[in-house]
Design a protein with these regions (language model features):
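Helix-turn-helix
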Residues: 1-13
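Hydrophobic alpha-helical connector segments
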Residues: 17, 25-65
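An acidic intrinsically disordered interaction segment
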Residues: 26-34, 71-82
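Amphipathic alpha-helical segments within well-ordered protein domains
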Residues: 31, 49, 69-70, 90-94
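Short alpha-helical scaffolding segments that buttress acidic/His motifs in well-ordered protein cores
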Residues: 48-52, 65-70, 106-113
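Hydrophobic/aromatic-rich alpha-helical bundle segments in the mid-to-C-terminal region
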Residues: 59-61, 76-83, 87-145
Length: 145
């Protein structure tokens, strides 16, 4: 405890720092997936899909099961970190050139796959299949069948 108090004045500051670290790690993981040669609409969304739908532990930390984060959002500073992050993603994905409807469906589907992977409900094969389908949807593709 004394080591933590040396770096953080209280529990809330520690939690805010942890949240900021997780938010930053996800954003960095997505940005590492941006294809600089891809100038088509949906470039950021494709990076988002590739980052979320690979099973990377760094990314899955962001989507850890709810009990891990229980009680974290009990104070304004933590809520502010999450709201800022959510607003950043909403703004940047909206400006990515895809229709708002496509952004909504593809983004939430990618997040759902990531969450399912956290619970061990997706195999690498099913993640790869979902990833390919979602990538296709960013390029105007339709659902099969």
């Amino acid at each position: 405890k004394s080591g933590l108090l040396h770096h953080f004045a209280n529990r809330e500051q520690l939690i805010v720092a942890l949240l900021e670290d997780v938010v930053t790690a996800l954003r960095q993981a997505v940005m590492q997936q941006v294809d600089a040669s891809d100038e088509r609409p949906g470039r950021l969304m494709r990076a988002y899909i590739r980052a979320l739908c690979t099973g990377s532990q760094d990314v899955l930390r962001y989507f850890s099961p709810t009990p891990v984060w229980a009680g974290v959002l009990d104070f304004p500073e933590a809520i502010e970190v999450v709201e800022r992050d959510s607003a950043w993603w909403a703004e940047n994905l909206a400006a990515d050139g895809l229709s708002p409807q496509r952004v909504l469906v593809v983004r939430r589907a990618a997040e759902g796959l990531a969450m399912a992977a956290c619970f061990g409900e997706e195999t690498q094969a099913s993640l790869a299949e979902g990833r390919q389908l979602l990538l296709s949807l960013t390029e105007g593709g339709e659902l099969p069948g």
